[in-house]
Amino acid sequence: MGPHIFFRVEDEDSRARYSDEEGLFAEDTDTWVNFKSRDRRLLGQVERHLDWGNRVPTPFISMYCDEGVAHREAERRVGEGKKDVRVYKINMRKSDERREYRNIRLLAERLDFDIPEHAWNNSEYEYIFLHHVPYSAVVDWIDL
């Protein structure tokens, strides 16, 4: 069983967004995804999500299972001049809905693809969630 506490870093340019009283939403909530698949479609979706230059919406929301990693990422963004930097704390045991999520390194290994160099360091702690994380799971946040 994986972790149940996660941290989402968001800023003015984040593709996935928090909505008051609804939760966190991926930019694309319509695309069907089967995490158990090994087909090229899933691989393409995950690769696009990890490509920071990609402008095509993806059905994923990135989060970290390590608070220190999330806060370092948030501080990096502040240092780059990003505005509206916020770290959300997510407790999936508080969620009133079941959600699907996977560790990015384990998924990359199963799909046999290389994580981009710029994303490698944090990927050990990174999880991608499918479509939506309900408001009930968002237990706290801090603004930087």
PLM features per residue range, with description:
Residues 1-144:
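NAD-dependent ADP-ribosyltransferases
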